[in-house]
Regions:
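Membrane-interface "cap" regions at the ends of multi-pass membrane proteins
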Residues: 1-59, 70-73, 198, 208, ...
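Helix-loop-helix connectors at the membrane interface of multi-pass transporters/channels
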Residues: 91, 95, 125-159, 338-367
Length: 389
């Protein structure tokens, strides 16, 4: 292969070292980055389930989650430092370990996993859009939803569902492919907006009956026998669970740390994950405990405590609160999809065909594949156990 062709097969402008002018991420940006990663529906369910479902000592869960995030902090610094220093995405740095060809095919595995999860996440994101549309129609004219056109289903979805998944894929593809400066704004906006939404719901639960909800929060805390040797196993399990939750993000962290100003900002920003965990855990746990206390005043809701935000919304009878919560869920889900699945898939695909693709064209391919995966998720992929591995 000639030197010119070899150069074309190795790089393009999206893979080269970041211009120093574009190294504009500081610790506050990384605070929002880690906030987005924990603010997902899965993150909400995971944190609250660890505290209230498995009958674990509260201190065991607390210190287990702290230890887990400390491990994330250490490994994120190790992986992120190289990308921050050299301004290169993670998949390009892999060339030093796996070689050019090895890095391409290793990255391709990450691409397939990322695109598959992007499609699934897009499907669930579209469900939130469809709920918004249904609420809007129901609030205007409820009988419209009974029309025959809405009773026709294809691949398990009706007209509203198809409209929703098309909206979800177009919005994500358009916004996420606009460049890292736009993605940075999305990340910052999402983190702040979701925390603002959680604060609103926290206050709405608290102020509905301060004494009742505060007592409900205290009642779910289990602090006895923390130093019991039998708690060591659960402590390790919680630590491992939290680390596993962030492991996909750690693997691709260099795709983001390449934009960080310096190593000091990198370490400060990564340490903010612990602060994010504390803030998010408190809000999530208080909302879940307070809602559970109110719901269990009805004998029909005595069976189990709800930790999934969508399950909690299903028990509300206030359309405005449901509508508002769905908007925050959409923001959180979309931004998580951006960080965990879309951007890493872009870089790995461009690295595989650097002479043919750009970030924008790779984004278009990911959007198309994600759409195909999303529309077949309900009727086919979920039925064959596509995530059983």
């Amino acid at each position: 292969m000639s030197p010119q062709n070899l150069k074309k097969s190795l790089t393009n402008w999206d893979l080269v070292s970041v211009n120093p002018i574009d190294k504009n991420w500081d610790w506050k940006t990384l605070f929002c980055f880690w906030g987005v990663n924990i603010q997902s529906v899965i993150g909400f369910s995971l944190i609250t389930s660890l505290y209230v479902i498995y009958d674990l000592n509260t201190f065991v869960v607390f210190f287990g989650t702290i230890l887990g995030t400390l491990l994330v902090y250490i490994f994120s610094n190790l992986i992120g430092k190289l990308s921050q220093k050299n301004g290169l995405p993670f998949v390009v740095l892999l060339r030093s370990s796996f070689g050019v060809i090895g890095a391409k095919y290793f990255g391709l595995i990450r691409f397939f996993v990322g695109v598959f999860l992007f499609g699934i996440q897009t499907y669930f994101l579209s469900k939130a859009f469809s709920y918004l549309i249904r609420i809007a129609i129901f609030s205007t004219e409820p009988t419209i939803l009974d029309k025959e056109i809405f009773l026709i289903f294809f691949l398990g979805m009706n007209l509203i569902d198809w409209t929703s998944i098309i909206i979800a894929i177009i919005l994500q593809g358009f916004l996420f492919s606009a460049g890292m400066n736009v993605n940075k704004r999305i990340i910052i906006f999402s983190a702040i907006a979701v925390y603002f939404g959680m604060l609103l719901f926290f206050l709405s639960v608290l102020l509905s009956d301060v004494k009742f909800t505060s007592q409900a929060f205290l009642n779910i805390l289990k602090t006895q026998n923390f130093l019991d040797k039998n708690n060591f196993g659960p402590l390790i399990t919680v630590t491992s669970t939290v680390f596993a939750y962030f492991s996909v993000v750690i693997l691709s962290f260099g795709d983001f740390s390449r934009y960080v100003k310096d190593e000091s900002q990198l370490k400060k920003g990564n340490f903010s994950l612990i602060l994010n965990l504390l803030i998010f855990s408190f809000f999530a746990l208080f909302i879940v405990s307070g809602m559970d206390a109110f719901l269990k005043q009805d004998p029909e809701n005595l069976n189990r405590i709800l930790t999934n935000p969508t399950d909690i919304l299903g028990k509300l009878d206030n359309l405005f609160l449901i509508f508002l919560a769905l908007i925050f869920i959409i923001i959180a889900s979309a931004s998580t999809n951006l960080i965990v699945n879309f951007i890493p898939s872009q870089y790995t695909l461009v690295n595989f065909l650097p002479f043919s693709l750009s970030i924008r064209s790779a984004g278009a391919i990911i959007s198309i594949l994600g759409f195909i995966i999303g529309i077949f998720w309900l009727t086919f992929l979920s039925q064959v156990g596509a995530l059983s591995f």
